[in-house]
Amino acid sequence: MDVMKGTTTVGLICDDAVILATDKRASLGNLVADKEAKKLYKIDDYIAMTIAGSVGDAQAIVRLLIAEAKLYKMRTGRNIPPLACATLLSNILHSSRMFPFLTQIIIGGYDLLEGAKLFSLDPLGGMNEEKTFTATGSGSPIAYGVLEAGYDRDMSVEEGIKLALNALKSAMERDTFSGNGISLAVITKDGVKIFEDEEIEKILDSMKAKPKKKTTKRSRRKSK
């Protein structure tokens, strides 16, 4: 079953935080159907998720998880733990395996007792807890290459953000079904922060600025 119809989404863990990033292009065959598609959602105070695949199926899952998270908080007075949220979604997807939701999901969250958590789920309910990083969608092979080359478990949040953005940028340059901007979220013990477009542009601009190379005596002789 091929569910990678378009999109690139990435998630990674660094410095006791989770970083999620997605592109904004929605495709209908070879047509760019939407240039501002929302693929990054806040589920609870400490949980966010990305979607790839069928838009209708993914949006139905988002609505369901938001409702379940609210019910959990009403009943217990606590936020739903990331593992419980991912397990709930895994059960929902598996129960619909005969008529599956055509979507791939990344769930990132912060557990106040266990720290940063990252999960990937397939359309049939298969769930993996990721200890480093993950990617979904048609641009994921390209994103994985960037993540593999640049990932360090001890990197700072700022370095993790730049790595996630680099992975998205590379995928958007090579995958025709990914593009039209980036959505970004960071999840820490302080909760979910979804970045504004202006904030993302500022980070991207800072990444373009390259430090000037020092001129050595040898290079000065060559230039004469």
Swiss-Prot record:
Activation and inhibition: The formation of the proteasomal ATPase PAN-20S proteasome complex, via the docking of the C-termini of PAN into the intersubunit pockets in the alpha-rings, triggers opening of the gate for substrate entry. Interconversion between the open-gate and close-gate conformations leads to a dynamic regulation of the 20S proteasome proteolysis activity.
Subcellular location(s) per record: Cytoplasm
Recorded family membership: Belongs to the peptidase T1B family.
Catalytic activity: Cleavage of peptide bonds with very broad specificity
GO CC terms: cytosol; proteasome core complex, beta-subunit complex
Keywords recorded for this protein, A-Z: Autocatalytic cleavage, Cytoplasm, Hydrolase, Protease, Proteasome, Threonine protease, Zymogen
Name of encoding gene: psmB
GO biological process, one term: proteasomal protein catabolic process
EC number: 3.4.25.1
Assembly and interaction partners: The 20S proteasome core is composed of 14 alpha and 14 beta subunits that assemble into four stacked heptameric rings, resulting in a barrel-shaped structure. The two inner rings, each composed of seven catalytic beta subunits, are sandwiched by two outer rings, each composed of seven alpha subunits. The catalytic chamber with the active sites is on the inside of the barrel. Has a gated structure, the ends of the cylinder being occluded by the N-termini of the alpha-subunits. Is capped at one or both ends by the proteasome regulatory ATPase, PAN.
Record-linked InterPro entries: Ntn_hydrolases_N (IPR029055), Pept_T1A_Psome_bsu_arc (IPR019983), Pept_T1A_subB (IPR000243), Proteasome_bsu_CS (IPR016050), Proteasome_sua/b (IPR001353), Proteasome_suB-type (IPR023333)
The protein's name in its UniProt record: Proteasome subunit beta
Major location (coarse): cytoplasm
Organism: Methanocaldococcus jannaschii (strain ATCC 43067 / DSM 2661 / JAL-1 / JCM 10045 / NBRC 100440) (Methanococcus jannaschii)
HAMAP family: Proteasome_B_A (MF_02113_A)
CDD domains: proteasome_beta_archeal
Residue span(s) of the pro-peptide: 1-6
GO molecular function list: endopeptidase activity; threonine-type endopeptidase activity
Role description: Component of the proteasome core, a large protease complex with broad specificity involved in protein degradation. The M.jannaschii proteasome is able to cleave oligopeptides after Glu, Asp, Tyr, Phe, Trp, slightly after Arg, but not after Ala. Thus, displays caspase-like and chymotrypsin-like activities and low level of trypsin-like activity.
Residues annotated as the enzyme's active site: T7
